[in-house]
């Protein structure tokens, strides 16, 4: 039997995940690199010259041109959260590495949060994943392995 490339594609192990995103500082650095890959750009005026300062334990960026202040989580699903970024990143990892759906109850147990919190985290993460992929169109040959299709069975009477 031929080896299925999809089943054996390299993923990110839990040990690899913890090494890459296991601390608050590493999660913060990953967000900065993702949001501003070429360096800070003011969302208000587009200027790149800025200063940084810490207020209430959070790093802020201030535009030198218009004095607009922002944080790395402003305007994201993390904006109003009291949870550490490490929990959000772990939730993202668990949701993206599972072959099947990860239940909110399972997230609750893995993350050590309430059911309501786990459910809201999952909802927000799935919403942004859907938004990002909604404009993407698959091209060429598309192979689907272990598809789970649902819905009510149509009666042929």
Predicted features, each with a name:
Residues 1-157:
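Residue-level recognition of single "structural anchor" positions
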